[in-house]
Amino acid sequence: EARKQLDLKIPYIIMDSDDPLDVARLNTGRKNWSMENYLDQHCARNKMDYRICRNKMQQYGINVAEMVVLLLKQTSLWSRISNDFKTGRFVIPAGGIEHADRIGSQLMQLKKYFYGMESTKNKRFKRSMVVSYIVADKHPKFDHRRFKTACKSKSSWFLTGTSTADYIAIIERIYNAGLTQKNKINLVEFYKTKEYQDK
């Protein structure tokens, strides 16, 4: 309206398209959209799987990329998964919500031990911490109850971590403290060899 009153041209584009994503593509301009921008776009279009994703993010304080990984029962955000998410083809498989709820509730139980594990910007778990826990959960010998008990006296160890590899090593040290050799887990090796991707 202001441009009209000032007798300025109003730029617009007319295009023949039935794809609502064209609006998103045009609005990206020079700056690429984040996963959160795409989530907002698809939620505004009332796509149920995206609305579930947003709800679970808020419920557990987990960022969009990690929640997508959890809902798809994966360990990494592969480019195909990312592209499907951006283009509106994200579909939660059977058991995906239950998987996300299980991991999300375990992280919430551990939250009080994770000093500094929240992003100061949005109060969500740090990405590297969530990814390291997803990897740990894939280890065949990992037991959440054992880890939770071990965290009670060793949670300050988390203060030294900054990356996923750091947190993997810290989880391994905390988990293995006081265990006999046969009950220990080799989480660092499990992570380095990417065995978790096959689980």
Pin down the residues of each PLM region:
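Accessory terminal alpha-helical modules
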Residues: 2-199
